[in-house]
Amino acid sequence: MTTVETRSIATPMGRVSYSETGEGRSLVLLHSLLTDRQAFDPVIPDLPGRVISVDLPGFGETDLVAPSIEDFAALIAGAVAEICPGEAPTVMGNGLGSFVALGMAIGHPDLVGALVLVGCGATFPEPARPAFANMIQLVETGGIAAVTPVALRRIYTDEYLDDHPEEAEERSRVMAHTDPTAFVEACRALLVVDFTETAAAVQARTLIVVGDQDQATPPDMARALDALLPHSVVVVLPELAHAPQLQDPRGFVNAIEKFLEGE
């Protein structure tokens, strides 16, 4: 049986909560805006080494910091430095977590040995930004429950939700525990994130993964980011949306395992 330990650690910017399992080379997991750290649970048993799932700012027991991806990255980097002393782990993020991972590679390169960016980009194009303003308004007026239907249609494809109503129920239960303030602050951070001028500085080898049905961070965003990064490759997963590790755990692991092994 896999043993999972839940912990928290104090950093100069605040407290960070996380869980870990396994031994060996460290792999840090950063969840998306629309999920929590448990969003990687379906694939953790098949991931190599020591796997560390981190709560992003305002999620779990992690303290909220200023609403910028750079500040999010600085908080998580401080935790990683303590959790993985003397090591530059692979950092894998999904959605919000992928932007934080990219921010770590830019601002704290000594703490990132490799990157797996699942649903990411350098910035959001103007047509995509009203979605964040809409989600902010929904949460501020109706709470997390008001944004849950929107979130579900971004996490999964419509066809998958139609065939797996139990997944919608489970995700809805998870999202009900999301702090509305944390959600809104994360949306504000994503509204203004822009790594187009700094992404070229990333020296870590990078795998960019995107579902071809991802409405939150479409394949065009992944390809635009790939054009900026010096050591990256893009993998497009068919018939998957924003959280492929939830929708097709085995297919997701198949897509990333060689990269994680260093190939």
Task: Cite the ranges covered by each PLM segment.
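Conserved HGGG/HGGXW glycine-rich cap/lid loop of the alpha/beta-hydrolase fold
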Residues: 14-63
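Active-site loop/oxyanion-hole signature of alpha/beta-hydrolase fold enzymes
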Residues: 41-45, 52-92, 254
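Gly/Ala-rich beta-loop-alpha elbow adjacent to hydrolase catalytic centers
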Residues: 93, 97, 101
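Flexible "cap/lid" loop of the alpha/beta hydrolase fold
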Residues: 102, 106-107, 111-142
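Conserved alpha/beta-hydrolase catalytic His-Asp/Glu region
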Residues: 126-130, 144-200
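Short beta-strand/loop motif that positions the catalytic acidic residue
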Residues: 202, 208-210, 214
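Catalytic histidine neighborhood in serine/cysteine hydrolases
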Residues: 226-243
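Catalytic histidine-centered segment of alpha/beta-hydrolase-like enzymes
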Residues: 240-253
